Amino acid sequence: GTRDTGSYATFSAVVNYFEWVGEHFTESKDRRDKIVAAGEAIHAHEKSLTDAMLFGTGNLKGLSDFDEVSIIGGVDNPRREGLVAMNISGMDAGELVEALNGRGIRVHIRKADHYSGNILNPLGLPSCVRVSMCHYNSEQEVARFLEAIRDIVAAR
């Protein structure tokens, strides 16, 4: 069949983007070195954001400091990559998503359906809140999220 040239163009744009990011983290002129540098920098930044979310930043408590918060996959999860799945005890995940979205913080619900059921069903969970971080997010955004969680927990 005919090749999907749009997919190739998109893939090329993604590779070019990673090369551009990598230029900020290496002086090498080699394209592969730049892409590797981008991947390493992105991983380090996302880990820093995830650690701030779990353990706190500045004078803000992290999610692991709230008795009311359960972190799916555990706090000390070396395989965690820029994502925290969580619940607040006694609060419906959909209600938490709405509360955070109402504060301008975009998070998503994951339900025990065809998409996430293979994880949530064995844990006996009907749903959870998924918080994703990426290389373009900042520690200030994590702080805003933690402030919102603090306020939501305090209001319960």
Q: Language model features by range: what are they?
A:
Residues 1-156:
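Pyridoxal 5′-phosphate
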